[in-house]
Amino acid sequence: MLFRMKDEKAHQLEAELDKLQADGPAAWAKLPEEELFTPAGFSEERAEATSYSNYSYWGSTFRAFFKNRVAVLLLVALIAVVAFAFLQPCLPGQADPNLCAVDPATGIQYRNIAPGEKGFIWGSNAIGQDLWARIWAGARTSLTIAFFVALIEAVVGITVGVLWGYVRQLDFFFTELYNICDNVPSTIILILISYVASPSVQTLILGMSITGWIAMARFIRNQILIIRDRDYNVTSRCIGTPTSRIVVRNLLPYLVSVIMLRMALTIPAAIGSEVFITYIGLGLSVEVPSLGNLINDGRKVMMQAGLRYQLLYPTIILSFVTIAFYLIGNAFSDAADPKNHLQ
């Protein structure tokens, strides 16, 4: 019944249309104005305005990141700690981290002075050195090592990873190189380099970087394989776009979030490696203040209740920097994901 009514209505409309066409333009003029078609107006300015998108990748990334209040607070605190660590020697009234302070009246060293007494903000160690100055100097040393290691690993790892994943002819070579390097524990290599070479900041940076890039390269390679043969990359190759331009314009922007996350995780990992290698006595010499040396010194007196501050303060700095970099890296990685820009 319903289909029959629709057919009758359709036939009626067709009949009216045929009649109007037969009568000519005069019949159209008799129709009410609201039944006539009204042509849409065209404005070139409005067309341009509606076709333009004001989307900005980095703008959307930072907007998404700043919505995470915990990450923002951690970022502000981390910037303050890192900035103070490097600016602390320039401030007035700061002690030499390697100076063994003595009592001018007796000539005896200020040994194991409690925090807040006799001008020692965080106390002194067993030979009268100011822990406030030594902890910030140790933070500078550890952060410097971590930043350089992260930078070297990023540059080498990204370069090798892109070549490994995009250039098919190099896949076999880099795969075998990865298998060789990955089968040797990085801790063993770090210990051997620290044992053979003289202990220094440069030695630790070299030892951590010589194998650290492997994980970054493999990670980038796997990501490149996912997007290498997508339509826009195949089209770019077909029209003769240089490989370097495809990598810079098509591949690397897609990997910004994961690269930032890997770099953010490399920094606390490098600090942890420095602490470990120094803790076992193969890292920096005891004259060089570092978080590893300070924690090792604090470990020796941790069983004495009145001296546990020597382990507590460097451990707090180490824990905060490590956790902050990890959480901020994860938050920025989530914010850099374009899927989160639509929320």
Language model segments and positions:
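Hydrophobic alpha-helical interface/terminus motif in multipass membrane transporters
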Residues: V160-W164, I193, I220, N233, ...
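Generic hydrophobic transmembrane alpha-helix motif, especially the helices
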Residues: I121, I152-G157, V162-I227, M260
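Non-cytoplasmic
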Residues: I191-L192, V196, S200-I205, S209-G212, ...
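Amphipathic cytosolic juxtamembrane alpha-helices at the membrane-cytosol interface
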Residues: Q129-T144, F148, Q169-D171, T175, ...
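Hydrophobic core positions of alpha-helical segments in small-molecule transporters
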Residues: L75-A77, I145-V149, L177, L190, ...
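Transmembrane alpha-helical interface segments in multi-pass membrane proteins
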Residues: L151-V160, D182, V247-V248, L252-M260, ...
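Gly/Trp-centered helix-boundary motif
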Residues: M1-I158, V162, Q169, N183, ...
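Alpha-helical transmembrane segments
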Residues: W213, A217, A270, V321-F325
